[in-house]
A protein has these predicted regions:
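C-terminal intramolecular chaperone/autoprocessing and neck/assembly modules of extracellular spikes
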Residues: 1-77, 91-103
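A detector for long, heptad-repeat alpha-helical coiled-coil rods in eukaryotic scaffold/tether proteins
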Residues: 81-84
Length: 103
């Protein structure tokens, strides 16, 4: 059986306007701190993860800040995907330029 959460995000062009290419994403992706840490609740280790407070500075759209300060911040990893894909596209374009210079 499936143990994850399945969800879809509406992305139909008919619901959008002012559509343009997104700005540079590589710098902001490079600014995201990927951390290793241990969870206080059970001591389990995460080799790769984020700290919501740090991510909030770079990608605020990916962090849910609760109304009450005693509640925990939550990261929506799906909101990071477009930024990461844009950064990969930029790297791919840079690689193509470098290939042309070598040849």
């Amino acid at each position: 059986g499936t143990t994850g959460v399945l969800y879809n995000i509406t992305s139909d062009q008919r619901l959008k306007e002012n559509i343009v290419d997104a700005p540079n994403a590589l710098d902001s992706v490079n600014a995201i701190k990927v951390r290793s840490f241990d969870w206080k609740s059970d001591g389990s280790h995460s080799e790769y993860g984020y700290i919501a407070q740090e991510l909030l500075e770079v990608a605020p759209e990916a962090v849910h800040v609760p109304a009450y300060p005693e509640e925990m911040m939550v990261v929506d990893f799906g909101k990071l995907t477009p930024r990461i894909i844009k950064a990969l596209q930029e790297l791919s374009a840079e690689i193509e330029i470098l290939k042309q210079k070598v040849n």
